[in-house]
């Protein structure tokens, strides 16, 4: 993701909660990465990619042109995330990985999964299902989009955003030794998919070498840079015709609570509503330590829930 962002600087966060650097900005949302462009902070990888594609930069854009290509790109995004490929891939992590033996990591995963604990019996059911889903995903790509031997999904000269959307969960899990049983999922069974994964890895490695390395900075330095940069996005509006606006009589400047609806939903942000439309909600945080030094957080509407801050406790969702 850092390669795709072409970030000027980065501040690595711990793999488990807490993340005090984000908390100081008033952000309780627990999934990473997040992207800051000035004092605007973007949540969720899909929204981050959309924002980066909108920027006017010298580097060529990776997004598709034309309605048919854009449709393939979008469908691959849905395929990987909403279609369950990533979540199924995560269920195939080998149990002997050091991080999975760490009690702190195990406790954090329970929190991430909204309190659900997985028993040994659960895994005997889940793992065969997950193998089948990944095998089916590989077969789908092998026999359709990659069937004619093309290098890249959209027949481009280099990987496009469509390739990124489709390859990343498979690239991730295929690179973990012992995750995929070779009699079910392998380069022998799916040669075109594995060749695509290998091409993608080579392209990423080459891109990393050709780009300036982002500067590593401390959390305090990141916060200073963010708060002194000003906002990069223009002010939006709360769409009065949006069904959510009508249902809850939402108004700009009112406190709202925003949280993801799938995982990590116990970590909820509270902020003042700045704008809302069918694609995105923007709210301004007010950190406990310094209420006037917040940021404007952008979250996608898809996969997130928004409510008046004083009504959240009554929601059983």
Give the predicted meaning of each segment:
Residues 3-110, 249-250, 254-260, 264-268, ...:
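GST-like domain detector, emphasizing the conserved glutathione-binding G-site
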Residues 49-53, 74-77, 138, 142, ...:
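Non-transmembrane alpha-helical segments in soluble domains
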Residues 63-76, 118-120, 204-219:
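A short, terminal or domain-edge coil/loop segment
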Residues 80-84, 96, 148, 200-208, ...:
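Short secondary-structure junctions and interdomain/linker hinges
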Residues 84-195, 202:
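GST-like fold's C-terminal all-alpha helical module
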Residues 124-126, 236-252:
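Short, basic/polar, glycine-containing "phosphate-handling" surface segments that engage DNA
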Residues 168, 204, 260-262:
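Generic secondary-structure microfeatures
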Residues 182-242:
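Catalytic cores of secreted or luminal carbohydrate-active enzymes
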